[in-house]
Amino acid sequence: MTEAWRPEDDEPRGASGPVRVRVPAKINLHLGVGPLRRDGYHELNTVYHAISIHDELTARRGDTLTLTMEGEGAGELALDESNLVIRAARALAGSTGVPPHARLHLRKQIPLAGGLAGGSADAAAALVACDALWGTGLTRDELAEIAAGLGSDVPFLIHGGTALGTGRGEAVSPVLARPTVWHWVVAVADGGLSTPVAYRELDRLRAAGAAGPPLGSTDTLLAALRQPDPRVLAAALGNDLQDAALALRPALAATLKAGEAAGALAGIVSGSGPTCVFLAAGAADAERIAAELSALDVCRQARTAHGPVAGARIG
């Protein structure tokens, strides 16, 4: 359902609302894709990393459950029962026995279908916002249990930071890492890329012997996160889905090449793509690389980000 969002709805948060939640985008520093499981998912061994590109969800009291949105992808997303935000709110209501009544408004910056888990981020934001609005008082771990039924990335985006994901990605545990800030350039492509399509393409490439060797263990990546040198982390980045994304969107090869030519320490496709992310030596280098990519015809938008950052948080 949709409902008009009025400027006066943006008053400061009071005792009963509104509740505003910011939620970050996600990249995969390591995405190892195993065989297809009987439940239709692939076994994953991944390291998630939350970065400073945020969506914002505002929840207000209402007589029904409604959703409006603005920003990235406005007009392209259905705002009905199929939307992950609505599904998340209903899942929380169903688990806690409260009426699913809220007016939700999404301000979106994370690109749609870009390999940055934008939909999963918004589901995580809805769980945190509605939990506060409805006073259901769930812990982060309890919210993450509900999140696991909504999507593989959603539990991570409840927590944020940097974490190891196993199973289909929904089993999340924090990693031991130095308190280092890593600087990234995010090159957003025109259009999105379906995650299921990317996985099917990887299966096809592997069956044809046309995919690279699987990444395997996360040990090298996890060890790199315990070092302060971004060059060590750069050498450990990897994504088994990159072959599939490049097969489906060959132009991404030029984006990766341009980023590394501009001075990035390494570049990979983010998740299932088509966004590419580049690790920079520092903040100034990231700004320079983003400016160079923006001047070329290799992406729709290049922006800087840093990580790790917190997951869905009120404020």
UniProtKB/Swiss-Prot annotation:
Its EC number is 2.7.1.148. The active site is at 26, 153. It comes from the Bacteria. One of its GO terms (biological process) is terpenoid biosynthetic process. GO terms for molecular function: 4-(cytidine 5'-diphospho)-2-C-methyl-D-erythritol kinase activity; ATP binding. It holds the Pfam family GHMP_kinases_C. It catalyses: 4-CDP-2-C-methyl-D-erythritol + ATP = 4-CDP-2-C-methyl-D-erythritol 2-phosphate + ADP + H(+). ATP binds at residues 111-121. Keywords: ATP-binding, Isoprene biosynthesis, Kinase, Nucleotide-binding, Transferase. Pathway: Isoprenoid biosynthesis; isopentenyl diphosphate biosynthesis via DXP pathway; isopentenyl diphosphate from 1-deoxy-D-xylulose 5-phosphate: step 3/6. Catalyzes the phosphorylation of the position 2 hydroxy group of 4-diphosphocytidyl-2C-methyl-D-erythritol. Belongs to the GHMP kinase family. IspE subfamily. This is 4-diphosphocytidyl-2-C-methyl-D-erythritol kinase. It comes from Salinispora tropica (strain ATCC BAA-916 / DSM 44818 / JCM 13857 / NBRC 105044 / CNB-440). The gene is ispE.
